[in-house]
Amino acid sequence: MRRLERTVPEIAADSAFGIACGASGLPVENLAELFLPEYFSAIELPAGLLETASAPELMAKVLDCFDDVQVGSIASPPEEEPPAPLLREFAERTGELLTGLSEAGIHTASLEFSGKTFADALLRALRPLAPALNRTGMTLLLPFALPCADPETPARFIQLLRRSMIPQLKLRLDLHLAALPPDASPRDLAGTLLQEVRSVFLRWNADSGEFPGKEQIAPWLAALERNGFRGSWLAAPQSADPLRIRTEAFRFTELLNELKQPSAQQKGFSL
């Protein structure tokens, strides 16, 4: 007997939504303004928080408020072929950060790198992190933005993950919603990359008047559900005024309420 697919409202009601505070540029001193557990169950923190005197207190509060916590952009691998001493320094520094986060009770973090980073250079930087990832049980996310100019890029990224042979290395999918082709399905755009996603950033330019609609997010909810996704969906609005994120956060809660209404969809998407 064929298993019935869950509807989008059912998926949305069971998903972890929140705000990507680090990716949105929210100053560390304003983080507490977005500790809104009555609306959200997930959050992304800026790596700069780790360097502040208030870090232990804030992180304890975050872990008390949210079920799904990650720290963004903890390190940037070298863009080109790095010398051995630089690789060792990167591995040691990043390994220490991973250990510290794990001891604090946070088990997910992301790296940051540009599109200019060569795959082989990235692999050489990532492989020395395997012992720290194994020891701590941390999940390390690599950002991948959609849409991308080359349709073969998702397949190449999958190959990079496989070549790394690091099971804790997964994907953070950055969806630039206004740029997504309206007639292309998630499968068309991402292919089997969807199987490796552990977190989704929903990106839009608030200063340009952009704001996502439920018709943009619903297909991705359904597609990732089919791939067993149980990660977080984080709003990451961009603005010249980083404090605008609070306004966007409350608008996002209204969108989530729409997605969770039975009228949002009466049957599963066929993607």
Feature locations, PLM:
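Glycine-rich anion/phosphate-binding loops
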Residues: 54-58, 83-98, 120-123
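Active-site groove signature of glycoside hydrolases
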Residues: 102-118, 136-146
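Glycine-rich, proline-tolerant flexible connector loops at the mouths of alpha/beta enzymes
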Residues: 42-66, 113-117
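Histidine-acidic metal/acid-base catalytic patches
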Residues: 1-21, 25-41, 91, 95-100, ...
